[in-house]
C-alpha cells in the first residue's frame, strides 16, 4: 500500500512516520499517554492505496476529533494536524499571500482583487516587520471545530482553494482597521491571536477587502407609508444584507388591512403581503454567495391593527399565503400594554394611518395620545389585553418568537435627545435612533472573559480587562471611519452618533474556571464587576480618544448632563473599584466621542472559533453535537471532562450516561455533588437568577443585551411570570428567543439500551422531588400574577423561575 505525496509521487506507508508526526504535534497536551499510537492505528485502519497525504492528514484529524470525548486535548490535536496540513499548502510569507489575493483574476481574466490596494501597499511597505511579528504557532491553540469554522467561512479562497491562514486573516483584519498605524495594527493582531477578544463576523469577513463593510447591525424605520417608501426601504435592506449586515426594521407605521388609501381611492392589504416580499428578499440576498442567509427582524407595536396576523407569520400551520417563515418577529411593547394585561383590561387596536403619532411617542406622552384615541373611538377593534397577551405567548411557545422588548425602558435609559427609538436590531441588543434619513449602525466585538482568569491564584484580572476594553473601544471607533456603508443613510447616522457595541463570551467558562456556581453570590458579584469595569474603561477611552470634539449629537444627551447608565436605573454605584466621580468630571469637561458603548450580543460563530461558551449564557448541555463536512462529532464540556478525567471518573460508561441524560449530570450517581452543582445546565438554573443577573449588569449596559429565556416545558403561567418579572426589574430586552426542550427525547442509537432506560427512570423519579422544591419567592411571584393567567390555564403550574 502506498500514498501520493504533494508532488504526486508514490511513497510507501510508514506507521512510524505517522506516529512520529502525531507525537510531534502532541506537545504540551495533558496526559495523552499511549493515545498517539491509537490514533495512528485508527489512521492505518482507514487508509486505502493511493490516498493523498493531505487526505491522510484529514483522516488523522477526524480520528482525533472522534476521540475528543476521551479527552478534550484530542480536539486540540485534531486542530493541530489540520493546521499543519494547511501550513503545507499555504505560504508563510505575508507579502506573498497578499500578492496572490490582490492580483487575483476571475474566470474571464478580469481583475477581482480580494484585498484593497491600500492594504496591499501597506503589507508590501511593512513586509519585513509583519513577517517577523506574525506568529503561526498560535494556530495550534485552536480546537478542531474552531479551526473548521474558520476554514469553512472566514479564510479567503482562490478558486475554492484556501489561501489565508488564520493568522493572515487576523493580520488582514487588524491592518484594515489601523491602516495608518502599524503599531496599533500589530497590537490588535497579537491580542486577537492570543484570543483575548474577537471582532464580529462581518469585520472578519470584510476588513481589508475592497468593500470593507465591517458593521454587524443595521436598524431601519420605514421611509414612508407608501409604495415608494416601502420599496425604498426594501432596497436598503437588500443592499445591507448583501454585505453581511443583520437588519431590524420597524413596520408599525405601515397602515393595517382594510385601511383607506387616499391616493388611489383603494383599500390596503395590510402588513402580511408586504412582509412576504421582505421574506423573499431575505432568502434571495444571502450575504455573498451563500455565506449565510439574509436575516431580518421585523418590529411592531402591539396596538397595530394587524398584530394578530403578524403573530401567526412564522407558525408551521395555516395558509401559506399568510406565512413568512424566514423573517424573525419582534414586539416593541409599551408599559401601558403590560399594565392593561396585569389589570385584565381592554386593549384597542389602531391603524397608524388613522391614529398617527403613536410610534413617535413613549411613556406618559404615549399613554395620553393612546387614551385620547380610545376616548374618541378611533380604534379599529377592542380586545381583552390578555387575549392578545396569550396570542403572543402562544406564538413564543410554538416558534420561539416574537422577540420581546420594552419600548419605554429602551427610550428612557439610553438616549432621550434624538427622538423616539422605534426598534432594535436582529439580535435585540442594539438600541439606537432611526428615521427616514438615518439608518442606525453598530460595530461589534466580544471579549473572551475566560482569558482573564489566573488559574493558579483563582482570581479574575480586572486590570487586564480594563486595558483590553479600552483597545476594543478605540478599534470599533476607527471602524466607523474605515467602514464601507451600503446606504448613505447609514453613514449619516454612524458618523453623527458614533455608537459601538462591546460584548462578551465565555462568562460560564469563567465561572467554571474560578469554581463559582452560576447562581452563587460570588458569580453574581463577578458578573456586576465585569460590566462595571468594561463600562468605565469604554467611557474613559471615549473621553481620551476625543480628536475633534464630541460626537455631533452630544449636546442634550444624558452624558452631557452628567447622567450615566446606572443613574437612569436609579442604582447607587460607589467609587470602590473605579472613580466614577472623577470620570463624570472629565466627561463634563471634554464630552464623549461615542454615544453608546456596551451591547452584549450573541456570539454563536465567534465563540465557536475561540472555543468558549456563547455570550453570558450558561451551558445548555454538557454534551452536544458538532457538524462539519466530514460528519458529526460529540463534544463534551471541556471543563467537566477535565474534572472527570482527573478524578478517574471518565470512561465509556460515563459517556453513555451523559448522552442518555441529554448532557445533564444531575442524575448520574457516580458524579459527586460538588461537580453536579458546578456543572448545572441552563435548564437546571432558576430563570429568576438569570434575569436578576441580567438586571445587575444592565446598570452598566447603555444599549441592551441578547437575553434568551430557557423553559423546559413552557406554559402561559410560566411565561407570564417570567415576562412580568423581567419588566418590573427594568430590563430593556425581555426575551430574545424562548428556548424549549422537546417533549420527547430522540432515539439514541449510540446509547446502550439499559443505560437509556435507567436514565429515563431516574429522571421521572426525581421529577416529583424537583416539582416540590419550589422556592417561596417563586410561588409568591406566580400568585402575584395568577389573575392574568388563571382563566387560560387549567394546570396547577409551578413558576418557570425554578426551571423545573
From Swiss-Prot:
Query: How does this chain assemble?
Result: Heterodimer of a large and a small subunit.
Q: Which protein family is named in the record?
A: Belongs to the ribonucleoside diphosphate reductase large chain family.
Taking the record's annotation, the residue ranges forming a coiled coil are: none
Q: What is this protein called?
A: Ribonucleoside-diphosphate reductase large subunit
Where along the sequence does the record put site: Important for electron transfer? 736-737
Q: Where is this site: Important for hydrogen atom transfer?
A: 217, 442
Active site as annotated: 425, 427, 429
Q: Name one GO molecular function term.
A: ribonucleoside-diphosphate reductase activity, thioredoxin disulfide as acceptor
Which processes are annotated in GO (biological process)? deoxyribonucleotide biosynthetic process
Organism, per UniProt?
A: Plasmodium falciparum (isolate FCR-3 / Gambia)
Task: Specify the ATP-cone domain's residue ranges.
Answer: 1-92
Q: Which Pfam families match?
A: ATP-cone, Ribonuc_red_lgC, Ribonuc_red_lgN
